Swiss-Prot record:
Its cofactor is Mg(2+). Signal peptide: none annotated. Pfam families: dUTPase. The keyword Transit peptide does not apply. PANTHER family: DEOXYURIDINE 5'-TRIPHOSPHATE NUCLEOTIDOHYDROLASE. Belongs to the dUTPase family. It comes from Xylella fastidiosa (strain Temecula1 / ATCC 700964). Its EC number is 3.6.1.23. The gene is dut. This is Deoxyuridine 5'-triphosphate nucleotidohydrolase. The keyword Magnesium applies.
């Protein structure tokens, strides 16, 4: 069974995409995210604690207002090298049409060099549900109630 396919409009802002480097693509048949590349002119070294805003070389438009996109880190970069997103997760609204930028942050202990064309993040398109706020005085009781951080334990 194949997943539903929706269009994602992109503008190529860096002519190396689609020629020198592939366009954003899914790495495997079951990948949830499209790999995004660093559209750099030269290698860039991030020393520990540094954050930089990188171009992906594309602009996107989701078109469908029932969708959003999130920019997520690549697990290997974070685990092996300490390279994560500077803003945690990037949220892209369906009506955004500007350049797709990625904030990368070196939270590791060693300098890390990003080469032009390196895969630096992934883009996942998700359905959204818009809500209408209902102001209430009390909530209907749930099994958890107001139990917060650590409430359910670790075992």
């Amino acid at each position: 069974m194949s997943a539903a396919v929706k269009p994602l409009q992109i503008k190529i802002l860096d002519p190396r995409l689609g020629t020198v480097w592939p366009l954003p693509t899914y790495a495997t048949e079951a990948s949830a995210g499209l790999d995004l590349r660093a559209a750099l002119d030269a290698p860039m070294t991030l020393v520990p604690g540094d954050a930089e805003l990188l171009s992906t070389g594309i602009a996107i438009h989701l078109v469908d207002p029932s969708l959003c996109a999130v920019v997520l880190p690549r697990s290997g970069l974070g685990h092996r090298h300490g390279i994560v997103l500077g803003n945690g997760t990037g949220l892209i609204d369906s009506d955004y049409q500007g350049p797709l930028l990625v904030s990368v942050w070196n939270r590791g202990r060693e300098a890390f060099t990003i080469e032009p064309g390196d895969r630096i993040a992934q883009l996942v398109v998700l359905p959204i549900v818009r809500v209408v706020l209902q102001v209430v005085d009390t909530f209907v009781e749930s099994g958890r109630g107001a139990g917060g951080f650590g409430h359910t334990g670790v075992r």
